[in-house]
């Protein structure tokens, strides 16, 4: 099924990867007591160049937890353990890629996104597949990022629920 101008919504997953430094330098954490969330800078459309959650589209035959673990690994290099579902969100993007035609009401992208709280369980932090960059952020850094749509809410929800 095509992602751009789809015939029906696509099911996607997002990984809210939250951690503290537990002596795992390969995870890129340097301040032991401050919880952080791992975000990627998107390397492809939609939302090219924006900071977002690692994630992607569910593949046929894959469980939601398998999909979120696969996408997290592909985009961050980390093996993660999905612990709980944080929410279900819908993302509908209309119009052309420039956003300059207000009369273009076509659905360009339509995703139903299921986001999971995840914790790193191994791997080496590196941007991969369609991520241009990957980085840990603290809660005070989040407002400046202007995260896409509902991403900020689910990130804060994940930080609030983390008992590490």
Segments from the language model and where they lie:
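Conserved N-terminal beta-strand and adjoining loop/helix that marks the start
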Residues: 1-37
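A generic structural micro-feature
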Residues: 5-9, 50, 101, 105-112, ...
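A structural signal for short, well-ordered beta-strand segments
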Residues: 15, 85, 116-118
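Conserved hydrophobic "DFG−1" position in protein kinase catalytic cores
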Residues: 17-18, 39, 118-120, 136
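Conserved Nudix-box catalytic region and its N-terminal flanking loop in Nudix hydrolases
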Residues: 32-74
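A short coil-to-beta-strand element that immediately follows conserved catalytic motifs
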Residues: 79-88
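Active-site-adjacent beta-strand/loop module that shapes the phosphate/pyrophosphate-binding cleft
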Residues: 90-124
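Nudix hydrolase/Nudix homology domain
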Residues: 124-164
């Amino acid at each position: 099924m095509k992602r751009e101008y789809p015939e029906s919504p696509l099911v996607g997953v997002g990984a809210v990867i939250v951690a503290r430094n537990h002596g795992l330098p390969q995870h890129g954490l340097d301040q032991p007591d401050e919880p952080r969330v791992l975000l990627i800078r998107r390397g492809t459309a939609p939302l090219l160049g924006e900071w977002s959650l690692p994630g992607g589209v569910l593949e046929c035959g894959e469980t939601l937890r398998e999909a979120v673990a696969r996408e997290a690994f592909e985009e961050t290099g980390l093996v993660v353990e999905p612990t709980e579902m944080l929410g279900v969100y819908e993302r509908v993007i209309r119009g052309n890629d420039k956003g300059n035609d207000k009369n273009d009401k076509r659905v360009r992208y339509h995703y139903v996104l299921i986001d999971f709280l995840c914790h790193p369980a191994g791997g080496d932090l590196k941007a991969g597949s369609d991520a241009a960059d990957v980085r840990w952020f603290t809660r005070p850094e989040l407002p400046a990022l202007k995260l896409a749509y509902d991403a900020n809410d689910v990130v804060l929800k994940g930080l609030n629920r983390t008992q590490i």
